[in-house]
Amino acid sequence: MTAAITQLKMLFKPQWRKALIAAAVAAGFAPVMAQETFKVGIVSFLSGQAAESFGVPAINGAKVLIDSFNKGQAPAPYNKVGFGGMKIEPIYVDENGGATKQVQEMRALYDRDKVDAVVGYVGSGDCLAVAPVAEEMKKFLILYDCGTPRIFEDGKYSYVFRTAAHAAMDNVSLARYLKAKNIKVESINMINQDYAWGQDSKKDFTLAMDQIYKGAKVEADLLPKFGAGQYGTEISALLSKPADILHSSLWGGDLQAFILQAGARGLFQKQQAVFSAADHVLPGLGEKMPNGVILGARGAYGLMSPKSALNDWWFDLYQKANNVYPVQAPYRMAQALMGLKLAAEKAMAANGGKKPTPEQLAAALKGSSWQSPAGTITMALGDGQQAIQDSAIGRTRWDAAKKMVMIDDIMRFPAECVNPPANMKTEDWLKAGFPGAKC
């Protein structure tokens, strides 16, 4: 016993402690790794109309991916344990409740829970509210989903990033798809939610169509409130104004409700539905989803995702854990967490293996590029803090044998074909006729 105690004392002598630390560093592990975790606040809708088809799948994606990271079971270059050896400790927060509540919740994550980063926010109004607050606090924030281009076109940030493309991509892709498929468009009906996402989507689609289908006329232009749920009046208005296509950026429970109510009244037999962000409702709606709907997924996600070893691994990981395939929300969450992981490890490689500061994380993520299950993510816009990526558009078809909605006639568009260049705002780019687009 005495000999054992003597050996323990020897380990804690200064020279032995230094030797152990040096050995740890030489082996590629910094001392921080033994005692520290990396805390991440993860925010998405866990209740309300956006939870079932969007928020909960996003959180489910975060859970399976973080578990794989912490076990060191993800494929390279994501195969290091946790973030550079630090175990990832997630704190999940419900996004429901409005922008003011989300600002309070985010402050609590940073101040009370001492998170090292926040990854979150689906609602464009929420993103517009939290981004300047995180910047003021000098805290690291990744916006993983929200679509409004205004974040980086109307503001300048050092600590705020968005690791997915904004809404311009979705609507330019739809317009290009319609033209490529020789779909007649002389008249357009529109229904979009009356807040930043819906307003921006409506504007971007209209401006894109002005270039590709010159002379096409907008008939009905409807803006129901977010979370309306009942669309009888709007459906009557749409039926009263015949049009070649019906454009919508509705999403979540709003989109599900609209499809069920409009389908029952035969709207989709009379007007070609063109939905910018609809893939996430396919598993829930099943055979109630109309055939032939043209839709996007806000990226090359889910049934429109590219073939790759990384995507095969991710698709299988999510599907086995949740008994359903991943749609856009978990894909966007995955690319955010993968970008954060690589940024953290890049920063640690430069700082001697210590937990990175917000400034070090920002420097590592700014202007970077990485492979995700959906393809390459490049921080090309917003002074290196706004991502661009490839997109995909297709048509729905119910497969009775598989008992699921399939997507056929898929077209993929390169990131630089459907996103504005770094030196132009979205509206200016659309009005100028897509200068610099590489298709």
Label every PLM stretch briefly.
Residues F29-A34:
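Sec/Tat signal peptide C-region and signal peptidase I cleavage site
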Residues I59-P90, D210-A216:
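Signal peptide-proximal N-terminal region
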Residues N60, T100, V115-L222, K270-G296:
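Extracytoplasmic ligand/sensor domains, especially the bilobed periplasmic-binding protein
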Residues I91-D116, A180, Q230-P242:
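Short, well-structured alpha-helical segments in soluble
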